[in-house]
Regions:
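Secretory targeting and sorting signals
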Residues: 2-34
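Terminal targeting segments of Actinobacterial cell-envelope proteins
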Residues: 1-7, 377, 447
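N-terminal pro-sequences and low-complexity stem/linker regions of secreted or lumenal proteins
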Residues: 34, 39-571
Length: 571
């Protein structure tokens, strides 16, 4: 809804503009409650100053501006937890150009090493469907393993062992840490695997300074990290290669904005920064992580944590916050793990409902000090919404068992708390489908599928989630606004899964592992491959540059927009 049509949003716009007069910094500079000894904070995250006059300028020009290629609507579909190689590594060629996938990975890039730095001979496994019924041992001479394995030290096809139709998925709300035994009582079809750890410090250890060789050692799921899917059998691939399908661009150099998991990368999707983890009174308080000399906060089947580097601590701890800025420095070989203070990097719950009754909660983020892209769009009079599967049920107090509270990033901000005008921008996915069918999409739509449909390993089926993605795309590309709409499909983060391409170092937050990304439109002339470097904040950059909005931090200010991808498809 634009400011000119909705008096409540208009009031919020005026309030934001007035408040901006007193805001010193936005987009990532640390407030006094965050402790940091790293001077790069100031250069990496701001400040970016805003005035009321600057905030009002885009409002007058918004109606005359469009997205790259003249598109008038942007739809961002944000899926869950897969690396590029894991899903798209076997894509092949597009319009004669090669997608950078598994075929370009060298043997060294595929090889995983143990904690002592020597290569595994075999890949250890603990997903129940990769260990039983007993698979014929083909690898028995690895000194790092206590049991023989069927898997040698290289990527393997998950589909060869867990097929899309196999009953290996848990019932909704049921935890299965090591996976669901195939055809066991209560098991559902869908070819689910177990979940894999995907956290801030663990990913940095797994990346190993760009060598990409510690994914197995730094994971609770060990060798499953090397599993990949048959790309050309995925529903999304099949759909995009039908005669009637829209054309697409594969962005094969697109990385998650920040190291770690879903909570943090959802924050970077909308705000291009890491939030401060100030706790909420009368709730479980978030804790700082405590690291060993390798930068790891805990042990795993193939990793034994050492004593903490901080002499004031007695044991390592995998907390919700970054490590404390202690006087004792980390070893020189892991200086890249330099984020410290009270930054919330692992999953925490919001102060505003809906939230989980378990887990730490953090105070609402002040939009006047740290605005997000919703604030920018509202101030400019540009219509937008965040659509989430299961939102209406969750907001009424009856959240589905697979509704993920930490996938709702705007709910962590004060201006979107219950009863505020901003709350009107948070809607159920069903309303997105209805709007697309009626030709009433806002200028910018973020779409977050419900847990059972978001492709997340452990609790969701990859093929079922891909089917849901296809249905969303069909809704957009057959609707009245199809030819004026640009769709971006990407994933929040890697889900703990290996990829062979090293992330280019940018700052202390990331980027992390390479993730799948597609740019799609019904009016594209042909499909293409884009090798340009992008990360999650490129979505923000696309919006900001299209509508003349102030960047939220120096990361999105520097990021490439997706204009190049659009140009490739329309040549």
């Amino acid at each position: 809804m634009s400011v000119s049509r909705n008096p409540r949003v208009a009031a919020a716009t005026l309030a934001l503009a007035v408040a901006a007069l007193g805001a010193a910094t936005v987009g990532g500079a640390a407030p006094s409650t965050a402790t940091t000894t790293n001077a790069t904070t100031r250069t990496l995250t701001g400040p970016v100053t805003t005035t009321a006059a600057a905030a009002s300028r885009p409002t007058r020009a918004a109606a005359r501006r469009t997205l790259p290629g003249g598109y008038r609507h942007l739809v961002v579909i944000y899926q869950e937890n897969h690396s590029f190689d894991n899903l798209y590594g076997r894509w092949g060629r597009v319009h004669g150009r090669r997608v950078r996938g598994l075929g370009q990975a060298t043997r060294a890039q595929q090889t995983q090493v143990a904690q002592d730095g020597t290569p595994y001979v075999c890949l250890p496994q603990n997903d129940v469907n990769l260990t039983s019924p007993p698979l014929t041992p083909t690898c028995t001479t690895d000194p790092h393993l206590t049991e023989p394995s069927h898997f040698t030290n290289r990527p393997f096809l998950i589909d060869n062992f867990i097929k899309p139709e196999d009953k290996t998925c848990p019932p909704p709300g049921v935890s299965a840490p090591f996976g669901v035994p195939k055809n066991s009582t209560g098991a559902l079809s869908g070819g689910c695997t177990r979940d894999l750890v995907h956290r801030f410090y663990q990913e940095q250890y797994q990346l190993d300074g760009g060598r990409q060789d510690r994914y197995t050692t730094g994971s609770d799921a060990v060798g499953l990290t090397q599993g990949v899917y048959r790309t050309r059998r995925l529903p999304i691939y099949s759909y995009l290669h039908r005669r009637s399908a829209p054309k697409y661009v594969v962005a094969d150099n697109f990385f998650q904005a920040a190291f770690g998991g879903s909570f943090l990368n959802h924050q970077w999707l909308i705000a291009a920064r890491t939030p401060i983890g100030n706790g909420v009174p009368d709730a479980t308080q978030p804790t700082n992580s405590v690291l060993d000399a390798n930068g790891m906060p805990n042990s795993y089947p193939q990793y034994k944590a050492g004593p903490p580097v901080d002499p004031n601590e007695t044991t390592v701890r995998d907390g919700q916050l970054t490590r404390k800025c202690a006087a004792t420095a980390l070893p020189l070989d892991i200086q890249y793990i330099d984020a410290c203070g009270n930054w919330a990097v692992n999953t925490v719950q919001p102060e505003s409902p809906p939230f989980s009754s378990s887990g730490s909660r953090i105070a609402l983020i002040d939009d006047d000090t740290y605005p997000n892209i919703g604030d920018r769009l509202t101030a400019a009079g540009i219509s937008w919404n965040w659509y989430s599967g299961g939102w209406d049920d969750a907001e009424s107090g009856h959240a589905g068992p697979q509704f993920q509270y930490h996938h709702q990033p705007f709910n962590y901000f004060a201006d979107y708390a219950p009863g505020t005008p901003g709350r009107e921008h948070l809607k159920d996915e069903r309303r997105f489908i209805a709007a697309a069918n009626r030709g009433q999409l806002p200028t910018v739509s973020f779409v977050k599928p419900y847990g059972a449909e978001n492709e997340h390993p452990g609790y969701a089926s990859e093929p079922d989630g891909s089917d849901h993605l296809v249905n969303l795309l069909k809704t957009v590309t057959t609707g009245p606004q199809a030819r004026k709409t640009l769709v971006v499909v990407t994933y929040d983060e890697f889900g703990g899964q290996w990829d062979h391409v090293s992330p280019p170092p940018v700052d202390k937050w990331g980027p992390g592992t390479r993730i799948p990304a597609l740019v799609i439109s019904k009016s594209f002339r042909h499909s293409a491959v884009d090798h340009r470097f992008y990360d999650t904040t490129s979505i923000l950059s696309t919006i900001e540059r299209s509508y003349g909005l102030e960047p939220l931090s120096t990361r999105d200010a520097r990021s490439h927009s997706l204009a190049h991808a659009v140009a490739l498809a329309n040549r």
